[in-house]
Design a protein with these regions (language model features):
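Extracytoplasmic "Venus flytrap"/periplasmic binding protein-like
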Residues: 43-47, 51-119, 154-156, 262-263, ...
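Extracytoplasmic/periplasmic substrate-recognition and gating elements
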Residues: 50-51, 56, 155, 232, ...
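Short, well-ordered beta-strand elements
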Residues: 24-34, 55-60, 84, 134, ...
Length: 422
């Protein structure tokens, strides 16, 4: 009987799952990352899960933009929010005052080994309100100037180091566009995505910031004439034929990759497109990418950051034990963000950007210095991805670029539209 009992107990034990399975913690993750970004993030999540048997990230990708942020807010209200999510830092000025994000305490950050000095200063500041940290930056992503080395060399605009020369200062830049046009080798010297507000906001805000101007100053929208000057500069590129009129995102890229445009302003997220085309022999020229030249007097470039944050929920606050695990995940993701850099993004974690592997990654390492002069969207509820400023840019800046509004009139109408929403 004793023997049979021992056999029965042994059999029961054998059927039990490993002890580690009992200790596994499930973490719910939401992001909005598609395309190449999505592929890279899924690979990072898989690697984390494979190397952390006691933690399992269950990831869901939702629709980018307003649908994502609306879903976060409504889910948190009823206690069905994720444990961790990606969040654009340009949305923090809207999210923090409305209580959407849960702040991290100094003790929580210290216990996880997360230190301010290890992160890009501009990005860390964007996550900090009233000395409270509401998220941890993952990258800095910005716009850059893509260029065709063959065309620039023929126009006398390429240095021996393979980098453009003679582009700083608006007069010099416009003269360079004319030199490129004079070669007769391209349809456009500069390709811009001129039919959509988001893309044009990034260029407009860059030129505005390069004048040392603010989009919002106290209660004023676009004080002074800096906004009109920035918009007039962009409109001139279109009216002179340097840049295309009312062209879609895909077509603006195709102009550059087909060799029909010598330069192209777009986000760093298109770096993988260029890398893949060249690798597969489908790009008929050598290319590079640099930070936007200083055209208006001060080096500055629009930027945003992907970050990690915890939704705030009064209905079902996250448990302290899960906060600890979430911070462990965030720390790991940043320590392994070199693979994220291959998407064109600049890692916000300085030990990665200081690494030998990153400094040898081109053209990323060349334009990475833009993080030091990055300018985030205004600290306002009007700002941020898919916010009112983006909509106003679509309604007023885009028509001005394409000859449907005078730049000064467009700026005045933009002021009135946004002032009513402040």
């Amino acid at each position: 009987m004793k023997k049979l009992l021992k056999l029965a107990v042994s059999a029961a034990i054998a059927l039990l799952p490993p002890a580690a399975a009992f200790a596994q913690t499930d973490i719910t993750w939401w992001d909005f990352l598609s395309g190449g970004d999505g592929i890279r993030m899924k690979a990072l999540i898989k690697e984390f899960n494979d190397t952390h048997p006691d933690i399992k990230i269950n990831a869901t990708t939702l629709e980018w933009g307003v649908p994502f942020y609306t879903k976060v807010q409504t889910s948190a209200a009823v206690g069905q929010q994720p444990d961790i999510m990606t969040y654009h830092m340009s949305r923090y000025p809207l999210a923090v005052p409305t209580g959407i994000l849960r702040p991290f305490s100094d003790e929580e950050l210290a216990s996880a080994g997360i230190k301010k000095e290890n992160y890009v200063d501009a990005a860390w500041k964007q996550a900090t309100f009233d000395n409270k940290v509401y998220g941890i930056p993952f990258d800095v992503h910005s716009i850059v100037l893509y260029y065709n080395k063959t065309i620039l060399k023929e126009a006398g605009l390429l240095g021996d180091d393979g980098l453009p020369k003679g582009l700083d200062g608006l007069d010099n830049f416009n003269a360079a566009l004319e030199k490129i046009k004079a070669t007769g080798k391209v349809e456009y010297p500069l390709s811009l995505h001129t039919d959509e507000g988001g893309s044009m906001w990034r260029v407009f805000y860059t030129l505005l910031s390069q004048q040392g101007a603010k989009f919002i100053d106290a209660d004023e929208i676009l004080p002074g004439d800096a906004g009109a000057k920035a918009l007039q500069t962009m409109a001139n590129w279109v009216t002179t034929g340097y840049s295309p009129k009312l062209i879609s995102y895909e077509a603006s890229i195709a102009l550059f990759t087909s060799g029909k445009a010598a330069m192209h302003i777009n986000g760093v997220w298109e770096v993988p497109t260029m890398v893949d085309l060249q690798k597969n022999g489908n790009l008929g020229f050598e290319w590079g990418a640099i930070e936007i030249p200083n055209l208006m007097g001060k080096q500055a470039t629009w930027a945003d950051s992907h970050s990690f944050a915890i939704p705030n929920s009064d209905a079902k606050p996250i448990a302290p034990e899960k906060v600890k695990i979430v911070l462990e995940i965030i720390n790991w993701m940043n320590e392994h963000s070199i693979s994220w850099a291959s998407a064109g993004h600049i890692p916000a974690y300085k030990p990665v950007t200081d690494s030998k592997e990153f400094t040898e990654m081109q053209p990323n390492a060349t334009y990475a210095k833009l993080a030091d002069t990055a300018v985030f969207d205004p600290v306002s509820k009007l700002a941020g991805v898919a916010g009112p400023i983006y909509e106003a840019t679509q309604n007023f800046v885009v028509p001005a670029l394409n000859g449907q509004l005078e730049p000064e009139d467009a700026i005045e109408q933009m002021r009135e539209e946004l002032k009513s929403q402040m």
